[in-house]
């Protein structure tokens, strides 16, 4: 875990994670803060040699579970290409893993305004490009 932030108000709590490999720190943070209304986690630009700094999509969903997330917004997957996977692969794997456990998720397009306190949405915008 390189850096992360918890933003908390009287009504809501958000976790913003930076680049991170999957490990026990997510469960520790989830235990400390009980739950998060939204977690923003990296998913993309992964490779076996980068496992300590970038999670694969299924690990991102597992981290969201460990954090007791009510909604997941996976980021770090659609703007730059550093890894050899197709650029849309991370989000499609996120969707599959999140839907398997009924975890609400967002798939906002770059530059799109996200109203995260509303119902989560999973528009497949990349398929329309």
Model-derived segments and spans:
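Cap/insert and terminal regions of metallo-dependent hydrolase folds
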Residues: 13, 21-110
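Core dinuclear metal-dependent hydrolase active-site scaffold
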Residues: 1-34, 110-129
């Amino acid at each position: 875990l390189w850096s992360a932030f918890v933003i908390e108000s009287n009504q809501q709590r958000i976790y913003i994670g930076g680049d991170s490999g999957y490990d026990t720190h997510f469960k520790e943070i989830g235990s400390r803060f009980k739950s998060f209304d939204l977690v923003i986690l990296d998913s993309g630009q992964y490779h076996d040699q980068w496992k300590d700094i970038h999670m694969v999509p299924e690990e991102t969903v597992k981290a969201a579970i460990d954090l007791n997330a009510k909604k997941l917004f996976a980021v770090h997957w659609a703007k730059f290409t550093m890894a050899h996977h197709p650029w849309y692969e991370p989000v499609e794997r996120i969707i599959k893993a999140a839907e398997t456990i009924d975890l609400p998720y967002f798939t906002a397009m770059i530059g799109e305004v996200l109203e995260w306190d509303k119902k989560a949405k999973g528009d497949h915008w990349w398929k329309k490009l």
